[in-house]
């Protein structure tokens, strides 16, 4: 066995490993020569040699192994199908109203430029019934947050803390809807006055707290609603068709007067503006009606007296 593989340590059996005497020197000349010679006399171990730990056998490499090398077994190839998320339109179909609304609001918050795209896709104002439905839901949420108390029915500071978030949500929603329901967003002034009166009545139904400072947001909203009344009345003053509908003017003037009395003068400015426009319109319409009547009489006299006056007035110039 070669040395690279290793060899056996220790003494061989049958006395082959014993040191021979001088008389036994049939195959070797002496002990020293026998120790240095390995021809015909086996392995002779010196007496002073100590047996140590066996040498570790090293592992043979692939090149040293005999025979052909066995190739590794390759796994079979299969078409693997992996999971994938739903498409966006499928996710939207599976969302309910609350989840879809929350997702859109988060998307707008992350990408503010999306607001312009939404305005382009939804250019028209929704149906007025949608406004009323939304505002009534917000108002109901305000009353749902009123804490129950057995000792007192009054709205104290603790109740304001509980209701503050719902109150701000309702007031902001009210102003947003009112601003979307007046010109130039809409051209129907009669519908605008109707919805503005509805929003003012709804604001009057807001709870009134014991501490006046807790009514701060409500009072600020009254000021904003009063400015919206001013704006809408100015738009109505330039619309002859709306001013000609006297019953509608008197109806909303009466409602605005009632709102001013209920709120102790919070609508004084729009009420005075309404009276001014009504007076100006009445002042302009009465002389105009008299002038039209006199002009008609003069034209009739000229028609009866002289046929040339018709050519002078140009009444028949455009008649085929």
Curated annotation (Swiss-Prot):
Cellular component terms (Gene Ontology)? cytoplasm; nucleus
Give GO terms for biological process: chromosome segregation; nuclear protein quality control by the ubiquitin-proteasome system; proteasome localization; protein transport
Report the GO molecular function annotations. proteasome binding
Subcellular localization is given as: Cytoplasm; Nucleus
Keywords in alphabetical order, please: Cytoplasm, Nucleus, Protein transport, Transport
* Primary residence: cytoplasm
Q: Does the keyword Transport apply?
A: yes
Record's superkingdom? Eukaryota
Task: Identify the InterPro entries for this entry.
Answer: Cut8/Sts1_fam, Cut8/Sts1_sf
Concerning Gene3D superfamilies, the annotation shows: Tethering factor for nuclear proteasome Cut8/Sts1
Question: Is Nucleotide-binding there in the keyword field?
Answer: no
Q: Please give the Pfam families that the UniProt record associates with this protein.
A: Cut8 (PF08559)
Similarity comment: family membership: Belongs to the cut8/STS1 family.
Per UniProt, subunit arrangement is:
Binds the proteasome.
Biological function: Involved in ubiquitin-mediated protein degradation. Regulatory factor in the ubiquitin/proteasome pathway that controls the turnover of proteasome substrates. Targets proteasomes to the nucleus and facilitates the degradation of nuclear proteins.
Q: What is this protein called?
A: Tethering factor for nuclear proteasome STS1
């Amino acid at each position: 066995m070669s040395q690279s593989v290793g060899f056996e340590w220790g003494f061989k059996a049958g006395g082959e490993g014993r040191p021979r005497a001088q008389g036994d020197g049939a195959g070797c000349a002496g002990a020293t020569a026998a120790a240095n010679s390995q021809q015909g006399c086996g392995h002779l171990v010196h007496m002073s040699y100590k047996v140590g730990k066996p040498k570790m056998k090293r592992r043979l490499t692939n090149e040293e192994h005999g025979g052909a090398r066995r190739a590794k077994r390759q796994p079979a190839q299969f078409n693997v199908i992996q999971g994938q998320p739903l498409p966006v339109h499928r996710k939207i179909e599976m969302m309910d109203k609350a989840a879809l609304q929350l997702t859109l609001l988060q998307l707008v918050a992350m990408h503010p430029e999306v607001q312009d795209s939404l305005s382009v896709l939804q250019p028209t104002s929704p149906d007025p019934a949608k406004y009323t439905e939304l505002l009534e839901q917000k108002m109901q949420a305000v009353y749902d947050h009123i804490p129950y108390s057995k000792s007192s029915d009054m709205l104290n500071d603790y109740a304001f803390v509980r209701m503050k978030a719902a109150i701000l949500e309702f007031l902001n929603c009210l102003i947003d809807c009112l601003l979307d329901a007046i010109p130039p967003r809409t051209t129907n002034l009669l519908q605008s006055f109707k919805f503005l009166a509805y929003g003012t009545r709804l604001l009057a139904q807001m709870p009134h707290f014991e501490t006046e400072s807790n009514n701060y947001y409500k009072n600020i909203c009254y000021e904003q609603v009063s400015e919206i009344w001013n704006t809408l009345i100015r738009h109505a003053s330039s619309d002859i068709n709306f001013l000609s509908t006297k019953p509608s003017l008197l109806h909303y003037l009466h409602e605005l007067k009632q709102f001013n009395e209920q709120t102790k003068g919070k609508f004084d400015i729009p009420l005075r503006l309404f009276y001014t426009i009504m007076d100006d319109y009445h002042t302009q319409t009465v002389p105009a009606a008299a002038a039209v009547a006199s002009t008609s009489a003069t034209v009739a006299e000229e028609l009866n007296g002289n046929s040339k006056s018709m050519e002078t007035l140009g009444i028949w110039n455009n008649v085929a």
